[in-house]
Amino acid sequence: MLDIQLLRKDIDAVAARLKDRGYVLDVAGFAALEAERKAIQTRTEELQARRNSLSKQIGVLKGKGEDASGVMAEVSGIGDELKASAAQLDVVQAKLQDLMLSIPNLPHESVPAGRDETQNVEVRREGTPRTFDFPVKDHVDLGAALGLDFDAGAKLSGARFTVLKGQVARLHRALAQFMLDTHTLEHGYTEAYVPYIVNAASMRGTGQLPKFEEDLFRVPRKMGHSAEEGDGERVENFYLIPTAEVPLTNLVRDEIVAADTLPMMFAAHSPCFRSEAGSYGKDTRGMIRQHQFDKVEMVQIVQPETSAAALEAMTNCAENILRKLELPFRTVVLCTGDMGFGSTKTYDIEVWIPAQNTYREISSCSNMGDFQARRMQARFRNAQGKPELVHTLNGSGLAVGRTLVALLENYQNADGSVTVPTALRPYLGGQEVLKPAV
C-alpha cells in the first residue's frame, strides 16, 4: 500500500508514475473522499470546541448557583452530533482504505518504461541452448514413460493437475531438496516450514487481497457461534497459499523487530495453489501452468537502504540454481507495464525450453519496498529508536515443476532416457540416467 501522504502532497505526480505501468488512478474519486473527510473532521473539531466551551460555562453557572439545564441540553445534543460525525468519518476512512488497497506500487526509477512483456529488457544470458541430432520431444511425451501421469491428475482433480510416480517423482523431490540445500548452505537463508492455509489478514498483508481474490482457492471454515450473531454460525475465509511468500513475509506482520535482526532471510519449499483465472486456453499441455505446483521461495526482510542490493543478490541466488544444473537461461528486468501489483522492481529469469524453442519464466524476484510492510505494519527500530517500515523482497528459487520440465527436455537422449545433471546425482543415490519403462 502506498503512503497516503504521497497522494495528499502531489497526486498528479503519483498518477503520472502509475500511468507508466498502465494504471489509471481515480484522482477525482480520491479528491472527493478527501474533501468529505476534511469537512467531517472540521465539523467535528468545531463541535468539540463548542462542547468544551459550553462545559466550562456549566461549571461557571453551577458555581454561581444558576440554572445550567439549557446549556447541559445543548452539550448533550452536541454529543449526539459527534457520534454521528464519528460514524460518518469511519465510512469515509473505510472507502479511502479500500481505494488505497487497490492502488499498485510505484515503479523504481531504474525500471524501463513499457506497455507489456515485449518491452522487458534483457540484462544477461548464460549458457548455450543445445543442438540436438534427433527429433526433440516435449516433457509430456518424455515424461509418459518416466512416471508423469496427466490422465490420473485429471481423474482425481480435473484439468491442470498432474500425478508424478516413480523416477520422475524422485527427480522432483531431489530438485526441491537440492534447491533448499543450496539456498541454506551456500546463500545464507534460514529454512522454514510454513502453513499451506492462511487467514485473510495474511493475504491482505502481501497484497493478494482484496484485488486478486478470484485467483485464490478459498477455504471457508465454520468458527462456531458468537453472541453478536445470534443463532448464526460464524464462517471465516481461509486461503490455500499461492506462494510461500505469503506466510514467510507475514511472519513480521504487526511486529517491531530489532534492527540487528535484519536482514531476515527465509527459504521454504511448499506447494502453491492458483486458480489461474483468466488463463483459459494458455499452456493447456503439460506442467507449465498448473493449479498446484511446488516452489522453493526466498523472502528477505531488510532495512530500506539495503533493499536494492538485496534484490540483485536474491536474483543471483536464483540464477545459481540454473548455473549448477547447467541449464541455459536469460534474465530480464520487467518494464513498468509488466510488473506485478506490489513490486517496485522485478527481474524474471527464463529457462530454455527446447520443445518450445524459447525461454520461459522459471523465477520472478521482486523488491516490494515498503508496500507490503505498510499493509502489514511490519517495522524495525531505526538508529534513533523510532519505528520505521521494513522493506520486503521475494523470489522463486525456483519453481520446481518448471525446472523439472526444463531438465527433462534439455537433458533428453535419443532413446527417451534423460541424463541426470551432475549436481543432482547425490540426491538420487548416484543415478546418472533416468531410463523409460519398457
From Swiss-Prot:
It is an enzyme of class 6 (ligase). CDD domains: SerRS_core. GO terms for biological process: selenocysteine biosynthetic process; seryl-tRNA aminoacylation. It catalyses: tRNA(Ser) + L-serine + ATP = L-seryl-tRNA(Ser) + AMP + diphosphate + H(+); tRNA(Sec) + L-serine + ATP = L-seryl-tRNA(Sec) + AMP + diphosphate + H(+). Keywords: Aminoacyl-tRNA synthetase, ATP-binding, Cytoplasm, Ligase, Nucleotide-binding, Protein biosynthesis. ATP binds at R274, S275, E276, E361, I362, S363, S364. It is found in: Cytoplasm. One of its GO terms (cellular component) is cytoplasm. The keyword ATP-binding applies. Its EC number is 6.1.1.11. Signal peptide: none annotated. InterPro entries: aa-tRNA-synt_IIb, aa-tRNA-synth_II, aa-tRNA-synth_II/BPL/LPL, Ser-tRNA-ligase_type_1, Ser-tRNA-synth_1_N, SerRS_1_N_sf, SerRS_core, tRNA-bd_arm. Pfam families: Seryl_tRNA_N (PF02403), tRNA-synt_2b (PF00587). GO terms for molecular function: ATP binding; serine-tRNA ligase activity. Pathway: Aminoacyl-tRNA biosynthesis; selenocysteinyl-tRNA(Sec) biosynthesis; L-seryl-tRNA(Sec) from L-serine and tRNA(Sec): step 1/1. L-serine binds at T243, A244, E245, E297, S396. Consists of two distinct domains, a catalytic core and a N-terminal extension that is involved in tRNA binding. Homodimer. The tRNA molecule binds across the dimer. Catalyzes the attachment of serine to tRNA(Ser). Is also able to aminoacylate tRNA(Sec) with serine, to form the misacylated tRNA L-seryl-tRNA(Sec), which will be further converted into selenocysteinyl-tRNA(Sec). PANTHER family: SERINE--TRNA LIGASE, SERYL-TRNA SYNTHETASE. Belongs to the class-II aminoacyl-tRNA synthetase family. Type-1 seryl-tRNA synthetase subfamily. This is Serine--tRNA ligase.
